[in-house]
């Protein structure tokens, strides 16, 4: 062992054989012929495999809520039809959903909203990540191939603070093999995955529990209440029936004093508020990105007229789906979701009851 620092000459310690009958080793330095007995605890650190000296903890700095902003996370995985790309919403858009935990959209999937409670591990999982083991340092091409990193199954790329890029590449699974005592059958259990981090010239083993990107799907991060404008941020709402006949409702006032009118006549406030709550209850049950066809018939529509100057109207349309008891939701011209068809049916029933 050679010890080096900037304040003294290098010192090399030579460790000999273990002293018989004692938990000690013969040790001398290159500066002296004196031989010492040093306890096992004093030299055991030098007896380990070289990989045991590689740091495995907090390979990426922990998240700092004051200084860190995650701008984008991209998940590439072989079993996905397309990459998942989560982008931070502009602050003014995020504020619209400040009470409903929406800060990211899936720009890869027509800008559908992601639920912050469901996507948290995917967004922030690289911060503070630690490995359970080290497979190789300065790995060769052969070692990368052995670990499945020549053709990775999953790649995660995080962009934070506009310019800092962190990439995690994941390869083959690591197994432990046990035998069933009764049948003798071998049982393989996944205990980790080989992976490499940008800026780290090593192949690590990561626990499956620390890798949410291996199972993440757009559906399990979907924010289901996809459009929830506050009623008093609107000047009006227009409902369209299956014949595209328009029913225009005007909204005036605020939470303290308000009124709602249809064709110049005031509508019962409690009834209209209940109707509006139903409009917001459309619950996206799955993502649907296919283009509409002639078989998808228009069922109903909603236009939200925002009070804020310069803010464009939001338009939600419902179309029939030929394959199941759902209808297709188009938001501002983009096909995005499916919802149970009964929602659109009851929407028109509730409209008739209000009138």
Question: Language-model segments: what does each one mean?
Answer:
Residues 1-355:
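Soluble, acidic/polar mature domains that operate outside membranes
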């Amino acid at each position: 062992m050679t010890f080096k620092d900037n304040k003294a000459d290098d010192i090399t310690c030579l460790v000999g054989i273990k002293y018989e009958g004692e938990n000690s080793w013969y040790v001398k330095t290159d500066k002296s012929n004196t031989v010492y007995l040093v306890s096992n605890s004093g030299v055991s650190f030098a007896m380990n495999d070289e990989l045991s000296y590689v740091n495995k903890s907090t390979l990426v700095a922990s998240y700092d809520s004051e200084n860190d902003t995650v701008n984008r996370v991209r998940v590439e995985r072989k079993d996905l039809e397309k990459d998942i790309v989560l982008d931070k919403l502009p602050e003014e858009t995020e504020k619209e959903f400040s009470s409903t935990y929406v800060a990211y959209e899936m720009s890869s999937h027509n800008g559908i909203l992601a639920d912050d409670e469901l996507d948290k591990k995917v967004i922030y999982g690289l911060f503070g990540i630690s490995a359970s083991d080290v497979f190789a340092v300065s790995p060769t091409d052969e070692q990368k191939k052995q670990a499945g990193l020549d053709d990775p199954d999953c790649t995660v790329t995080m962009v934070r603070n506009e310019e800092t890029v962190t990439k995690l590449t994941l390869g083959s699974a690591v197994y432990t093999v046990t035998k069933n005592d009764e049948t003798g059958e071998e049982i393989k259990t996944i205990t980790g995955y080989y992976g490499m981090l940008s800026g780290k010239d090593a192949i690590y083993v990561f626990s499956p529990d620390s890798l949410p990107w291996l199972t993440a799907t757009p559906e399990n991060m979907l924010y289901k209440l996809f459009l929830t404008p506050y009623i008093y941020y609107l000047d009006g709402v227009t409902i369209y029936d299956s014949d595209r006949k328009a029913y225009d409702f005007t909204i005036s006032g605020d939470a303290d004093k308000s009124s709602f009118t249809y064709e110049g006549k005031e509508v019962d406030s409690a009834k209209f508020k209940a109707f509006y709550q139903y409009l917001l209850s459309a619950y996206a049950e799955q993502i649907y990105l296919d283009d509409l066809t002639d078989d998808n018939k228009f069922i109903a529509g909603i236009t939200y007229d925002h009070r804020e100057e310069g803010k464009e109207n939001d338009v939600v349309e419902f179309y029939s789906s030929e394959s199941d008891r759902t209808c297709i939701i188009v938001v501002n011209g983009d096909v995005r979701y499916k919802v149970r068809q009964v929602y659109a049916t009851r929407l028109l029933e509730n409209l008739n009851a209000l009138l």
